[in-house]
């Protein structure tokens, strides 16, 4: 089962990398956070697994809008859908 999970993780990460390489360059950079939302999603999947990682990535994308300040927001050690405010 872990081999299957590993392959699914790699497949999702591959799709995100394809987005980064082929789709993202067609648009001006707009992400207000570091790391970018797509890199955050990859890190979250690697750290927390596919389900929690995708959930964290989706909520990060929802937070990335013109009404927020942005800044550094790395993937926290513990699963959460909120911004990591560790200083």
Swiss-Prot record:
Superkingdom to which the source organism belongs: Bacteria
GO cellular-component term (any): plasma membrane
Xref: SMART domains: Haemolytic
Organism: Ligilactobacillus salivarius (strain UCC118)
InterPro entries: Membr_insert_effic_factor_YidD
Entry-linked Pfam families: YidD
Keyword match Membrane: yes
Membrane topology: Peripheral membrane protein
Protein's job: Could be involved in insertion of integral membrane proteins into the membrane.
Cellular compartments annotated: Cell membrane
Keywords for the protein's UniProt record, in alphabetical order: Cell membrane, Membrane
Protein name: Putative membrane protein insertion efficiency factor
């Amino acid at each position: 089962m872990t081999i299957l999970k590993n392959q699914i993780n790699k497949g999702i990460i591959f799709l995100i990398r394809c987005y980064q390489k082929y789709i993202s360059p067609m648009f001006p950079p707009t992400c207000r956070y570091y790391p970018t939302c797509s890199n955050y999603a990859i890190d979250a999947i690697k750290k927390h697994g596919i389900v929690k990682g995708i959930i964290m990535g989706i909520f990060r994308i929802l937070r990335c809008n013109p009404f927020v300040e942005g800044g550094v927001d790395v993937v926290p050690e513990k699963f959460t859908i909120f911004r990591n405010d560790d200083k």
